[in-house]
Amino acid sequence: MVYQKVIQFDQENQFQDGLANEIKQLTWLHYENPDKGEVRQVLEDYHLPVHFGEYVYDQFETSWIEYYRNDAGDLFTYIIIQYPYGHEVISENTYHTAPLVIVMGQDLVMTFMNHTNMPFMLDIQRLNFPSDFPMTSAYAFVMYMFYEVAQAHIDAVTIMHGLIKQAEEEARHSTKNNVSYALINVNKGPVYLSTAVHNNAKTLSRINQYFNQLENDTRYQERVLNRVQIEMNQAVTMIENDMALINKLNDMLSNVISNNLNDVMKRLTVITIIMTVPTITAGLWGMNVALPLEDNVHGFSIILVGSIILSVIIYFIIDRINLFK
């Protein structure tokens, strides 16, 4: 699926530098779940290396940046950032990451991704720019993509936090294996998200180090770059907090399971002791010697009731002295 959009730049806020000089609009080409031939064709049309398009199919491709000039001398920036996906794509209660491939020129941005209708991409397509976020160049639009991807990570971490709380509550009251299996899924998500967010932050730093050499408007840095960095730092902090919670949850789960098993063993021990009384009584009256009540027509009933009464007395004694609590 191909999505095409022409974005008009904000002329009042436009800074004058080598990136935005006299450029009034941007063409954005967005490809979702494209086939390899489609990716190859569009890259060849702009005289770009076709291997750039191969990375979109590598689920484990990490975030990085590269600069390239084509035969016409046009500068293109090739960027990969990692976005999260979860219940929209997979059935597990966890998150994975996938690469968003960005090819940026002066008046052109091309993006490629393997998934369709991702919430953060729908926001980008609606051009829901944050307040005081001037859209002045292709670089600004790419920064907006970084912003939305950071927001997607924050949303994913928020959902993961709820899953962690749910697993914690289940671990308090269960010794079943499904709690451990749920915790395994919960463990996977923050690992993927943590790696992706840290890689994205490094790529953001590298791209800004290069383009800030061309940028003279300090207001732009305050309005755009700082907004993106704040969102990225928030995502990093939230993920680190969740990683710490999961580590504690792992320890807590081990302790809770151990305590629950101890409680089960205590109950079984009490039952065993109580059941020992009628067992011993039946053993004594089963001997082939003269025994009390052997000639009494109600002897069996008397012995049975006596055993039950004795078992109840033993139970209350154990309960009274808190022997197994």
Language model region names:
Residues 69-72, 188, 192-195, 211, ...:
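Short alpha-helix boundary/capping motifs
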Residues 34, 63-66, 84, 155, ...:
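Proline-rich low-complexity regions
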Residues 49, 71-72, 137-141, 282:
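Non-transmembrane, interaction-prone segments in cytosolic or luminal domains
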Residues 57-61, 171, 178, 185, ...:
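Residue-level signal for alpha-helical context at structural boundaries
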Residues 1-132, 203-217, 318-325:
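Helix-boundary and N-terminal cytosolic regulatory elements
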Residues 84-87, 94-256:
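Extended amphipathic alpha-helical scaffolding segments in membrane-proximal extra-membrane regions
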Residues 230-325:
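Hydrophobic alpha-helical transmembrane segments and their immediately adjacent juxtamembrane loops
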Residues 23-25, 141, 178-179, 299-300:
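A short, structure-level motif marking secondary-structure boundaries and short turns
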